[in-house]
Structure formats: structure tokens, C-alpha cells
Amino acid sequence: MTDDKDAKLIEAGRKLFARDWQFIWASPSIQTLPPMDGVEIAFAGRSNVGKSSLINALTGRNALARTSHTPGRTQELIFFEVPGKKDLRLVDMPGYGYAKAPKSQVASWTELIHKFLLGRASLARVYVLIDARHGLKDVDLEILGTLDRSAVSYQIVLTKADQVKPSELASRIAETEAALAKHPAAFPNVLATSSRSATGMAELRAAMAKLLEERSS
């Protein structure tokens, strides 16, 4: 990709996420999902990995997605879009893995996650968020396996990159990319981000603008 093309995508991403993003729907079950309009991009990850914070940073809206220090606070599929626009919809998924909730409830929304990933025709990409301090865990690999079966393209995004040393971050990226070699549906490169410092946000916005451009052409 040329520098000129990069710059155009960065600007397209900036404009895309400068729009008036709003909450539109919350689905506690597959039966309550909204109609499949346009392109959907979902954000998955372990509980408390920073999905809601990332969505807020992308959109520049500090309170768009509810954030919490309590693992497992997001227990539904939360949908966001720009009113009057049907081109792109963002999905904040329940966190998987450890959560401060009854086991039956955790099992219910874990099932919801897997069913959504396997059966949503409008789902164009999933960003799987991994805490840069901890790397891939077994529960993450389970989700990657589900995504491999679903044939939905996905990419790993490291969160909280500002909380690790540059050398540690480089090692984390390298080991994660090596693990992805076993997953054919995964993008081979890993994005490092920080919601706090905005590291990687322009690149992530540009990647989504590129996807939207490809889908509309």
C-alpha cells in the first residue's frame, strides 16, 4: 500500500468515526437481534479487556459504550450505528472468560457469543481484543476456533499497549502473530492499541474504512 493510499484511508477512517455514533439496540439472545442491515463489525475479548473503552476511543465518545472495572458487566450484544446511515454497525460483545456473575448467566452469554459469530450473515469482521500485558489464553483460542469455523475474517488487536514496555510489546506482537499462523481466517498482522493514549486508533479506523470501501465497490 502506498503512502498516498495510507493517508487517504486514515482520513476516510477519521471521517467515518467523526460521525454521530449512537446506541441503537441491545440483544440478550439470538432471538432479539436487530435486522441485518449493512456491514457489521464486532469486538470480542475476555472480560475487562477494554472493548467498551476501545469503542469509545474510536468514536471519540467517552460515554457511548458503558465501561466498568467489574469483569462481565456487558452481558448483551450492544449495537451502535449512525442514525440515518445503514452502511456500518459496531457490535460490543459480552466478555468471555472470568466474570463476576452466576455461572449459569456466564454460560448463557458465552453461548450467545458463539451463536452470533457462527450465524450472522451481515458480520464482516471481528476484532478479537487481547490484553497486551497477558497475551493469548486458552479461552481466546476457543473463540479463534469458532471464528475459523464461521469463515468470518478476524484480526487480533492488543489493548492497553501503553502499559507494557516497548520491548515487551514487540515480543507480544511476535508471539501472537506466530500463533495466528495456525488460524487461516485470521489476519496475519496484529494491531497494538491504547484507548488511553490513542495509540493505533487511526490505523484501526483506517482498516474499517478500507473494509467498508471494499464492501461497497
UniProtKB/Swiss-Prot annotation:
Per the similarity annotation, which family is this?
A: Belongs to the TRAFAC class TrmE-Era-EngA-EngB-Septin-like GTPase superfamily. EngB GTPase family.
Enumerate the SUPFAM superfamilies for this protein. P-loop containing nucleoside triphosphate hydrolases (SSF52540)
Q: Which residues bind Mg(2+)?
A: 52, 74
User: What is one Gene Ontology biological process annotated in the Swiss-Prot or TrEMBL record?
Assistant: division septum assembly
Q: CDD domains this protein is in?
A: YihA_EngB (cd01876)
Source lineage: Bacteria, Pseudomonadati, Pseudomonadota, Alphaproteobacteria, Hyphomicrobiales
For binding GTP, which residues are annotated in this chain's numbering? 45-52, 72-76, 92-95, 159-162, 193-195
HAMAP family for this protein: GTPase_EngB
Q: Name one GO cellular component term.
A: cytosol
Main function: Necessary for normal cell division and for the maintenance of normal septation.
Which gene specifies this protein's sequence? engB
Instruction: List the GO molecular function terms.
Output: GTP binding; metal ion binding
Domain EngB-type G residues, every copy: 37-214
Q: List cofactor names only.
A: Mg(2+)
A Pfam family that this protein carries is: MMR_HSR1
Protein name in the entry: Probable GTP-binding protein EngB
| Sorted UniProt keywords | Cell cycle, Cell division, GTP-binding, Magnesium, Metal-binding, Nucleotide-binding, Septation
